[in-house]
A protein has these predicted regions:
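Short, flexible, mixed-charge acidic loops at enzyme active sites
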Residues: 1, 132-133
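Flexible gly/pro-rich beta->alpha loop and the following alpha-helix that scaffold active-site loops
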Residues: 1-35
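Glycine-rich nucleotide phosphate-binding loop and flanking beta-alpha elements
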Residues: 6-8, 41, 90
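Short catalytic/ligand-binding loop motif for oxyanion handling, primarily in non-cytosolic enzymes
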Residues: 8-9, 43-46, 128
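Catalytic nucleophile loop
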Residues: 27-51
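Pocket-forming structural segment of enzyme catalytic cores
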Residues: 48-129
Length: 133
């Protein structure tokens, strides 16, 4: 599930968000891998019980995140990695979720819970402004 300009709980304006949350819960319940980036991270986290709120300030631009738990997905990273941020809302960690990374202003930058992986940041964009890879 990728990003978008809406809020993860804007069900009245974007009814498809509710269906995405339902699909996220079903994927985790059945052990199917699911990845969320930015808004997708927030949809998965809230679908799994995390709280959504406005951040203290928008987090926009390239800035570092810190890996807090060495996980298979992130084992190739240094302890700190500079990534693109583009969000106003933040989520808490779902119950039983494993915190993987944080930034100075966003406590939950990445988490894992069962088959779900959520990343608030945009790893698909590099500092040169093009798609990574």
């Amino acid at each position: 599930i990728m990003g978008g300009p809406m809020g993860a709980l804007d069900y009245d304006k974007y009814p498809g968000l509710k269906a995405e949350a339902k699909l996220a819960r079903a994927a985790v319940a059945s052990g199917k891998p699911i990845l969320g980036v930015c808004l997708g991270h927030q949809i998965i986290a809230t679908a799994l019980g995390a709280q959504l709120r406005k951040g203290d300030a928008p987090e926009i631009g390239f800035a570092p995140i810190k890996r807090v738990d060495k996980h298979d997905f992130f084992s190739m990273w240094d302890k700190q990695l500079t990534v693109l941020h583009w969000h106003n809302d933040v989520v808490g960690l779902p119950a039983e979720g494993q915190l993987l990374s944080r930034s100075s202003s966003t406590k939950v930058q990445a988490f894992r819970l069962g088959s779900a992986l959520g990343m608030q940041f945009h790893l698909e964009v590099c500092a040169a402004g093009r798609m990574a890879g």
